């Protein structure tokens, strides 16, 4: 059974995550004090029910040792997993402005910006030991729920899920990436007026990139690197591996490369997902 601990900065989507986990059959508790985690787990152990608990800055233990002690006292039937949700500072500020809610630390006479920064410092002990960090900056409520369903169901099946995501460096590097590869040195379809409106998912762009030897070499060497270390990653109690491929805008080269790598590992029987951050952002 799984004990999913959901944490993250306020406004990053913890309530959405908890609702998604409840839909997946988890017994969910919002803002349970850390010291009560072992008691909850023992209560649910006999019923064979996986649980999800949210922890935010209001019920953080006074010291990391208290959290470690609670984890050590969990029944052996439970496998604890820590999910940490985050978003960039500007996104969190915008979400608070849209909802007009008060930040949990606002009562300490802090501005919203200062409260967000302070919260980040207080939650760092949890973030540093998270099994999965999810950046929700560009996600809608439905996208976050769907992403959690695909990733966490894979985790419960103890199967490594390889996630290949494209992005644009001008929009920032994904904070949930395990590996980041820069493909800005490859030939750029952007400079062809006919290809500029298209994306790396379109056949003319794929044909353009497929004509270049350096593109083939990059794909071959990247997949060879991943194949070399994949067996160790699979035996290291991991459930996911996020590989981010970045070009300038996240529209052509990174999309094509991410899809090529995803197709290759999918053909090898791996559990593979692909997503394209810039293209998804353009849809919203």
Swiss-Prot record:
Residues noted as binding ATP in the record, renumbered to the chain: 8-15
An example molecular function term from Gene Ontology annotations: RNA binding
Keyword terms, alphabetized: ATP-binding, GTP-binding, Nucleotide-binding, RNA-binding
Signal peptide coordinates: none
Matches recorded under InterPro entries: P-loop_NTPase, RapZ-like, RapZ-like_N, RapZ_C
Chain positions recorded as GTP binding sites: 56-59
Statement: the UniProt record of this protein carries the keyword Cell membrane: no
Region named RNA-binding: 266-284
Record has DNA-binding as a keyword: no
Quaternary organization: Homotrimer.
Family: Belongs to the RapZ-like family. RapZ subfamily.
Protein function: Modulates the synthesis of GlmS, by affecting the processing and stability of the regulatory small RNA GlmZ. When glucosamine-6-phosphate (GlcN6P) concentrations are high in the cell, RapZ binds GlmZ and targets it to cleavage by RNase E. Consequently, GlmZ is inactivated and unable to activate GlmS synthesis. Under low GlcN6P concentrations, RapZ is sequestered and inactivated by an other regulatory small RNA, GlmY, preventing GlmZ degradation and leading to synthesis of GlmS.
Protein name, UniProt field: RNase adapter protein RapZ
Organism for this UniProt entry: Salmonella typhimurium (strain LT2 / SGSC1412 / ATCC 700720)
Classification of source organism: Bacteria, Pseudomonadati, Pseudomonadota, Gammaproteobacteria, Enterobacterales
Gene: rapZ
């Amino acid at each position: 059974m799984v004990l999913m601990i959901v944490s993250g900065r306020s406004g990053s989507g913890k309530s959405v995550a908890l609702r998604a986990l409840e839909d997946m059959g988890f017994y969910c508790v919002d803002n349970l004090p850390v010291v009560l985690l072992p008691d909850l787990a023992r209560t649910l152990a006999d019923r064979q029910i996986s649980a999800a608990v949210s922890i935010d800055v209001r019920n953080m233990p006074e010291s990391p040792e208290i959290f470690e002690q609670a984890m050590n006292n969990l029944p052996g039937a439970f496998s604890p997993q820590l999910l940490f949700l985050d978003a960039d500072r500007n996104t969190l500020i915008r979400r608070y402005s849209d909802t007009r809610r008060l930040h949990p630390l606002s009562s300490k006479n802090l501005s919203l910006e200062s409260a967000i920064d302070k919260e980040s410092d207080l939650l760092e002990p949890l973030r540093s030991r998270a099994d999965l960090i999810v950046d929700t900056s560009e996600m809608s409520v439905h996208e976050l729920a769907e992403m959690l369903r695909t990733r966490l169901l894979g985790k419960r099946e103890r199967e490594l899920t390889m996630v290949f995501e494209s992005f644009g460096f001008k929009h920032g590097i994904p904070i949930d990436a395990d590996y980041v590869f820069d493909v800005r040195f490859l030939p750029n379809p952007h400079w062809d007026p006919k290809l500029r409106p298209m994306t790396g998912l379109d056949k003319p762009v794929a044909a353009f990139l497929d004509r270049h030897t350096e593109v083939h070499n990059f794909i071959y060497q990247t997949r060879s690197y991943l194949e070399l270390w994949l067996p160790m990653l699979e035996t290291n109690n991991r459930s996911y591996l996020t590989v981010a491929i970045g070009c300038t805008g996240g529209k052509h080269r990174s999309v094509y490369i991410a899809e090529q790598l995803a197709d290759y590992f999918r053909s090898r029987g791996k559990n593979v997902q692909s997503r394209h951050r810039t293209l998804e952002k353009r849809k919203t």
